Amino acid sequence: MAVTFQHTPVLLTEVLTMLAPRPAGQYLDATVGGGGHALAVLQAAQPGGRLLGIDADPAALAATAARLQAAGLIEQAVLCHGSFADLATLAATAGFGAFDGILFDLGVSSYQLDTPERGFSFTADGPLDMRLDPTQGLTAADMVNRLSERELADIIFLYGEEHAARRIARAIVEHRRTQPFQRTAELAEVVARAVGGRHGRIHPATRTFQALRIAVNQELDRLRATLPQAVDLLAPGGRLAVISFHSLEDRIVKQFLRAEASGETPRLTIVTKKPIVPTAAEVANNPRARSAKLRVATRIG
């Protein structure tokens, strides 16, 4: 059964407060998703505001286009299919110059998590895919069936911060000798057996699935590649806002902002000395928001 592209924008009020969209401003949503943030920013930037929306997932772009069309704002937006690692090229091709605000929402959408066919979920069986862009690159099945035990252990430990990484990698390699992995439920079961059951609130496969998703989509490498481009594209006084969902992303963002705000010729001023997190009310309404952290900086110049 098809799942409608539903994704509740996280920290929406806080994002609008921090970006402070103004009429005739130019804005970039580098992870446009279902268009929740994009629509709110574009509405606040009228009259005359424009928005460039980028996403690796064609389904996300279609959902955003429909949302902006319904709001009568599609003519004020340009939507591009691609990776935010190519931010500068995509912006130039779309005819945008300096931006007054740039947003990254690094979370996987509810649509992607809740659509078994996308292969992100360990709670609903589907093909073991995990690609944010289904037209590009290796799938998670390719990785677990081809990589060495050591390579798998390194990925699961580094990207999932999973202490049972070696045990999980060994179990994966043993299983695939007789039956290559094809389905998410199959991998989740093997991982759960290797870990030895649930520990606390999270499913035993949570960290392994996170690690594979990061590896499949080269998420951390692409984040490191895009952040300097984002600063280059900001107008003086423009703001960069980044929402992260796990410690690996947040560490990269935090260290990058600190580096850009220091030295002889700093390019940024940090606005959020500590990250902004969701209110208890937002988490109650949208439990997937609970780990979100928003960091913001302003372009000097």
From Swiss-Prot:
> Could you tell me which InterPro entries the record lists for this protein?
RsmH, SAM-dep_MeTrfase_MraW_recog, SAM-dependent_MTases_sf
One GO MF term attached to the UniProt entry: rRNA (cytosine-N4-)-methyltransferase activity
Known EC number: 2.1.1.199
Which keywords describe this protein according to UniProt?
Cytoplasm, Methyltransferase, rRNA processing, S-adenosyl-L-methionine, Transferase
The main location class comes to cytoplasm
Protein's GO biological process: rRNA base methylation
Catalysed reaction(s) here are: cytidine(1402) in 16S rRNA + S-adenosyl-L-methionine = N(4)-methylcytidine(1402) in 16S rRNA + S-adenosyl-L-homocysteine + H(+)
**Any idea which positions bind S-adenosyl-L-methionine?**
G35, G36, H37, D55, F84, D105, Q112
Q: Supply the PANTHER family for this chain.
A: 12S RRNA N4-METHYLCYTIDINE METHYLTRANSFERASE, S-ADENOSYL-METHYLTRANSFERASE MRAW
The entry's function note states: Specifically methylates the N4 position of cytidine in position 1402 (C1402) of 16S rRNA.
Q: Which family does it belong to?
A: Belongs to the methyltransferase superfamily. RsmH family.
Q: What is this protein called?
A: Ribosomal RNA small subunit methyltransferase H
Native species of this protein?
Chloroflexus aurantiacus (strain ATCC 29366 / DSM 635 / J-10-fl)
List the gene name: rsmH
